[in-house]
Amino acid sequence: MFHLKEQQTSIKQEIIAGLTTFFTMVYIVVVNPVILANAGVPFDQVFTATIIASIVGTLWMALAANYPIAIAPGMGLNAYLAFHVVSASDGGITYATAFSAVFTAGVLFIILSLTPLRKQLIEAIPNNLKYGITTGIGLFIAFIGLRQAGIVAADESNLVTLGNLHSPGVILTLVGLLISVVLMVLNVSGALFIGMAATALIAFFTGQLHFSKGFMSLPHLPEGLMISNPFTAFGDVIHHGLYAVVFSFLLVTIFDTTGTMIGVAEQAGLMKNNKLPNVRKALLADSTATTVGAVFGTSPTTAFIESSAGVAAGGRTGLTALTVAVMFAASMFFSPLVSALSGIAAITSPALIIVGSLMMGSVSNMNWKEMDEAFPAFLVILAMPLTSSISTGIALGFISYPIVKAARGKWREIHPLVIVFAILFFIQLFIL
């Protein structure tokens, strides 16, 4: 079913890869409820909804597309929903109405995924931009690891600066990073997961990891279904004029997922002649998960860049994603345990930093000799970590690419879809 021999992998390797991916991204089941609480959504509601959406999307990715990519509600759009859509409306838009907008975007997303458009879009992206996306995601994910661990910290004059290297959390991260790097240098199977497990044990014995709330609890949805009638959802969007909100959800989700899929697939060696096999099935995963998640009460889902950690651990097939889905299902009954582990950034940050370094390898495939090819890709690489947004990096690449190509007199090399989305990105960034 998963073609393990064809991908030169094994059940053990895929399970270890799935566990690695899960533990690097499980923070979302705690962080997402905290962020959406600012919109008034009950914590337990979002906790359970986040897991349900993640299971649906990741299972689809595993069984239909056979990709080692996990799906979950994305960071960024959850904050956009909580602060820009709900809180900024001063009571004019409830969180239930906001989820109607998410649901509508999800349905439109499914329709787009069923058409050839998204597949054509992936194939239309110039090779240099594809390599730039992979490299930019690598820098972004490494920066996330450094920031979460406290190795770099916010600074008023320089934006970021070196963190407190005497902090127990930072020291633990550096120890975990050293363990993981040494294991990878020695080509130890499951190096990243072993490094995470070793760091967790050190955290426990040094008093940084506590299980004061126990290990298990029963899941529940205190408000039931957020959207019981899909037709009401569309009506809410029309009544409140949430067209710009739906457009933002749709555009950002499309390119967050597309960018992550390209980056992870490139890293895993799944791209065939710069094309993704089973791409339509893969693209349906996040759109379906977004729609289901909105019904229960969570923000739009996306392909998680932390999937690259599982790929670095050897994940090559949907068995990796299936393992992640099973772990998400189990986490529904172990919220205190999950909360405790995800609260220690030092456990997962080393894996993110190492994966970032591995993804940087794509920079060697880029054409740096032609300015009209190099500069748009450079903007993608630069913008992703500096704006903390994959879609913004892609947007700047898309907007600049037609401009520099036309200036060079190479307008015939510009795919029409690149021009269309360059215009859409310009509208989203500078007008909406």
From Swiss-Prot:
Stated role: Involved in the uptake of the purine bases hypoxanthine and guanine. May work at purine concentrations higher than 100 uM.
Topology in the lipid bilayer: Multi-pass membrane protein
Upregulating conditions: Expression is regulated by the purR regulon. Down-regulated by adenine and up-regulated by guanosine.
Pfam family, one: Xan_ur_permease
Chief localization: membrane
InterPro entries named among the record's database cross-references: Azg-like, Azg-like_bact_archaea, NCS2
Protein localization: Cell membrane
Keyword Membrane in record: yes
Transmembrane spans: 15-35, 51-71, 92-112, 133-153, 174-194, 196-216, 234-254, 340-360, 379-399, 412-432
GO CC annotation: plasma membrane
Protein name in the entry: Guanine/hypoxanthine permease PbuO
Gene Ontology terms, MF aspect: purine nucleobase transmembrane transporter activity
Keyword terms of this UniProt record: Cell membrane, Membrane, Transmembrane, Transmembrane helix, Transport
Family listed: Belongs to the nucleobase:cation symporter-2 (NCS2) (TC 2.A.40) family. Azg-like subfamily.
Gene, per the UniProt record: pbuO
